[in-house]
Amino acid sequence: MKSFVTNWLSGLAMGVLASATITVQAATDQVIRVGVTSGPHAQIFEQARRVFERDNPGYKVKIIEFNDYIQPNAALDAGELDANSYQHRPFLNAQIKARGYKLYAEGKTMIGPMAIYSRKYRKLEDVPVGARIGIPNDPANESRVLLLLQKQGIIKLREGIDPLTGTNATPIDITENPKKWKFVEIDAAQLPRTLDDLDASAINADYASKAGFNPARDSLLVESGDSPYACLIAVRDKDRAQPWLGKLVQAYQSPEVKRYIETEFKGGILAAW
């Protein structure tokens, strides 16, 4: 009987010790807080999170979703996030210039092609003279649309526009507009809702996807795959040497995540690596 009690107590002690060890281990996991915009960025980063946590014991990723393009950088700069994943370099550069953020970008993630959609017209050439076209009201994406239209030969911009150096185009930089299109600047998140009122609107891929659009299938005009507007993972400048950053990029750029992008979005979103 004494032997039984001794063995039972010994087993109980070992169980308590094992439980405590697991609890301590869980408590020491480093949590990386990553901000994303809802839609494709959130969906894809969930896949990257799974790969990252699988391959890097001791780390956890907490994904925090936002519904606009301004707050993820504000939260990152304020230390409320450790990283974000939703923006291309021209947008980041514009935010740094305008707001004084000390942010650093590492690793390409995906390209969400900018595209022009309409509920009134099926072809770009059908959009009439004097049409009202919705475009994003942030400098980087507004410039992106105007450069796309210039590449298509619909408008012409003044010389010297280079979004990668922060020289963005606005409607006042249009020097030729033979179709006399009127550009209406609207918050990017609201552009899908404008399609009943405007002749057409240029919509970022994440907001287009949330509204049920696929740029490869539904648009009048879409960026090509060689677009310079690849999205990135951003951190505060002081965190650029953190060991988890390279691991996070590696997880995002894994074969599993690429396969998910190709299967889930069917050309509507492209892997940028």
In which residue ranges do the predicted regions lie?
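Bacterial N-terminal signal peptides
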Residues: 10-20
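Beta->alpha turn/N-cap motifs
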Residues: 39, 67-69, 79-80, 84-93, ...
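Short helix-initiation/N-cap motifs at beta->coil->alpha
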Residues: 63-74, 161-193
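A conserved helix-loop-strand patch within extracytoplasmic ligand-binding domains
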Residues: 106-156, 258
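Short, polar/charged alpha-helical segment
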Residues: 31-32, 38-62
